[in-house]
């Protein structure tokens, strides 16, 4: 690898501001704000709006809209019953 062109990779704490969920991971992102982790070391803190702890897809609170097809909409519009067995 070429020296001097790659960003510094280090451990940071990602903090979900919605749920206050924290996890430690490696990143090239840095911050002037620091926090003490469970191992007693201080790491930079990166604040997140959404993480796997608060995103509806990962929490199971996601709502799926019923996507009716064109035939179903036509049958519904004219009060016809579908031929599904």
Swiss-Prot record:
Q: Name one GO cellular component term.
A: ribonucleoprotein complex
Q: Which GO terms describe its molecular function?
A: structural constituent of ribosome
Q: Which InterPro entries match?
A: Ribosomal_bL28/bL31-like_sf, Ribosomal_bL31, Ribosomal_bL31_B, Ribosomal_bL31_sf
The UniProt entry's GO biological process terms, in alphabetical order, are: translation
Keywords associated with the record: Ribonucleoprotein, Ribosomal protein
Pfam families tied to this protein: Ribosomal_L31
Give the highest taxon in the source lineage: Bacteria
The text of the family note is: Belongs to the bacterial ribosomal protein bL31 family. Type B subfamily.
Assembly information from the UniProt record: Part of the 50S ribosomal subunit.
Q: What is this protein called?
A: Large ribosomal subunit protein bL31B
Which species is the source of this protein? Staphylococcus epidermidis (strain ATCC 35984 / DSM 28319 / BCRC 17069 / CCUG 31568 / BM 3577 / RP62A)
């Amino acid at each position: 690898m070429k020296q001097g062109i790659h960003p510094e990779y280090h451990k940071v704490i990602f903090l979900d501001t919605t749920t206050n969920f924290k996890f430690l991971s490696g990143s090239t992102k840095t911050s002037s704000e620091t926090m003490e982790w469970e191992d007693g070391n201080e790491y930079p803190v990166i604040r997140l709006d959404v993480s796997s702890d608060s995103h509806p897809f990962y929490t199971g609170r996601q709502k799926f809209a019923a996507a009716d097809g064109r035939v179903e909409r036509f049958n519904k519009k004219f009060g016809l019953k579908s031929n599904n067995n």
